[in-house]
Regions:
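Short, acidic/small-residue loops that bind anionic groups at enzyme active sites
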Residues: 1-5
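Structural motif
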Residues: 15, 22-24, 34-37, 62-65, ...
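Catalytic-core signal marking the mid-to-C-terminal active-site face
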Residues: 106, 111-199
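Glycine-rich beta-alpha junction loops
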Residues: 42-45, 91, 137-139
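Short, contiguous, pocket-lining structural segments
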Residues: 13, 17, 30, 79, ...
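Small-residue-enriched flexible segments
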Residues: 46-108, 125
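Phosphate/diphosphate-binding glycine-rich loops and adjacent basic-rich segments that engage nucleotide
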Residues: 7-76
Length: 199
């Protein structure tokens, strides 16, 4: 997990103070299966998605952000000038604050607000720390490792049996499709990339 620039208002707040503060988790799977992985922002949506809506002149759904006056807005330009909101209200806000603390002050680095102040309008990438925890299941489980890994697979199978999908399943499917068919991008992005290539 890591902070970013301060682009997100805390639950009940009206101006940016927190970062999008992504959180990721990975779990190995046997027999050559891709790992169980999720990686998501603690904001209602990633800032990049707001930027894509802005580029395509598309409104954003209610609940993604507020304008600089703290009013809910569906205008991506207003939200980019205001603040994103956390996902899940106070729960998402609490997770975001936790990430600020453990990947900022706890490791001797900046918070998202401090990163944005340090940037001083330069528009550079966030200046932040990262906290990565890696655990070796064999150290916890020893000779029972395979039994417990099988229990994890049972959990995954039970989720899929209900018609739900695992986080990252869609990503793996999209990756396979892209490897076969290439990528598709909006015409507006193609035009922008073409323009940049001519510079």
């Amino acid at each position: 997990c890591n902070p970013s620039h301060a682009w997100v208002a805390p639950a009940g707040g009206n101006r940016p103070l927190l970062g999008t503060n992504p959180l990721a988790f990975g779990w190995p799977r046997p027999n050559g299966q891709p790992p169980f992985i999720f990686d998501f922002a603690t904001s209602a949506i990633a800032r990049g998605d707001i930027e894509l809506h802005h580029r395509e002149n598309k409104p954003i759904p209610e609940g993604w952000g507020i304008d600089r006056l703290g009013q809910h807005s569906q205008n991506p330009a207003d939200v980019l000038d205001g603040a994103l909101l956390t996902f899940g209200g106070h729960k998402g806000s609490a997770l975001s604050i936790m990430i600020e603390l453990i990947a900022g002050p706890l490791i001797g680095d900046l918070t998202s607000a401090e990163s944005l102040a340090y940037d001083d309008g330069a528009g550079a990438s966030p200046y932040h720390g990262e906290l990565i925890l890696a655990m070796d299941p064999e150290r916890f489980l020893g000779s029972t490792l395979e039994d417990y890994m099988a229990r994890a697979e049972d959990l995954f199978s039970s989720i899929i049996a209900q018609g739900a999908r695992l986080p990252s399943q869609r990503r793996y499917t999209a990756r396979q499709r892209t490897q076969k068919e290439g990528i598709s991008i909006p015409e507006s992005l193609y035009q922008e990339l073409s323009r940049l290539a001519r510079l």
